[in-house]
């Protein structure tokens, strides 16, 4: 038996990366998982490969009506909702590690277009707000449940290379705490997870920029550059994986985690200890 047997979970942004890792672990623990993602084709493919019967569909989670319709479809098909994971989000790493070029969502505040700021807050904070808003009535109908919000260690401190992303993720952490207190009487637990260094498309872009602009990395592959950063920057000297995040999300959403709410837990190999 798994920790999540008989439960129904929704994972936003679950087609690949962290979201796919969360969906995979939750399915292995017995949950039926629905994946909502802008890339509906990949969402369906990922869902088809889960350990339990899954569902994958296209959905833009920063739009309330499509999100409402998608979650309603999940509830109609699976019979309810117990777990909602607000994972969808995006960060734009500045291509230049000296932080001298404007790069949309990354770089200096003075170089950032207001539209880029708004986009980052929509993708990372508005999406979490809407996911919570849509999920709560269904969780109440089940007598309680779990909301897990994927934040970032960038939201725990200063991130001069990613001001909009960091501000949005700090907002996710604050929203998680406020929601935890607000919905505790309804037996709904809300927690945030703050991942550290994972090999994602954002990190691949940053490592590619470092390869082009840092002489010592000129002959290195982006993946090797990332692992060098991990070696020098992570006390445990190892990268974090989507499955690492998935195991914590599953634990927080299981009966074992029934007394944990309003927390922001780092899965970062000790980065934030420094």
Predicted regions, residues:
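Substrate-binding pocket helix/loop in short-chain dehydrogenase/reductase
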Residues: 95-109, 113-121, 230
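Residue(s) in the substrate-gating loop at a strand-loop-helix junction
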Residues: 152
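Active-site helix of classical SDR
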Residues: 132, 168, 176
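Canonical Rossmann dinucleotide-binding motif of NAD(H)/NADP(H)-dependent dehydrogenases/reductases
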Residues: 3-33, 179
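Short C-terminal tail/terminal secondary-structure segment
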Residues: 157, 236, 249-250, 256, ...
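Alpha-helical segment proximal to the catalytic Tyr-Lys
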Residues: 137, 181-182, 258
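Short, small/polar-rich loop/turn modules that mediate ligand/substrate recognition or access, typified
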Residues: 184, 189, 260-262
